Amino acid sequence: MRIYKLGVIGKPIGHSLSPKIHNLFAQQTGIKIDYQPYQVSPDALDIFIRDFFNNGGDGLNITLPHKIACIESADDKSALVKKIGAANILIHNKDSNKIIADSTDGNGFVEDLHCKAIKLAQTNVLILGGGGAAQSIIPAIQNEKPANIFIDNRSPGKIQPVIERYLSSGDNNDGPFSSLSDLKSFSGTSHIKQGM
């Protein structure tokens, strides 16, 4: 039986539950995997990714701080990655010998909300942060038809380009984007309790 060489890269990485989750999933499905965590600094990212796949790697999960920078190491990008400018998975296509960047964050995020019976339709949504993880969930949130999407970041100057990207994408029919300075109109939302 084939053993798939997989891993998760980030910095730091010791806190990641990905190895445990993926190994349990592999046991449940009868797939053999070698899934390892790799702490990779930003300056070594491209070299690590190329070496991993050149030495038989099948796929990598990507976490902070590499979700944006990792796409530079990909030979091809999904339409979603081209739109959002971030990825959370790199897959080696053995037939074409190409590294493919994709993102499953948004669909996974929304599916988790659905499992908890949380609906986003016609609600106000607040996103804190404007990095790769935040940007990767915006299209999936838009598909849920919220009334408004509010977004803010510790560095306010980084938010405007994110807002403009999604407003200019031509498919934002799901309510306007606003910055946190407009929060006075952020009312009528469901509150998610800590510990859920």
Regions found by a protein language model. Name each.
Residues 1-2, 95, 121-122, 145, ...:
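Residue-level preference for short coil/turn positions at secondary-structure junctions
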Residues 2-116:
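Phosphate/diphosphate ligand-binding glycine-rich loop within oxidoreductases
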Residues 5, 34, 124, 147-150:
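Residues at the starts of beta-strands that form the adenosine-phosphate
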Residues 10, 103-106, 113, 118-146, ...:
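Glycine-rich adenosine-cofactor-binding loop
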Residues 22, 70, 137, 141, ...:
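Hydrophobic packing residues within well-ordered alpha-helices of enzyme cores
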Residues 32-36, 98, 148, 176-178, ...:
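Conserved beta-strand segments of alpha/beta enzyme cores
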Residues 144-169:
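NAD(P)-binding Rossmann-fold cofactor-contacting core
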Residues 169-196:
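Short acidic low-complexity segments
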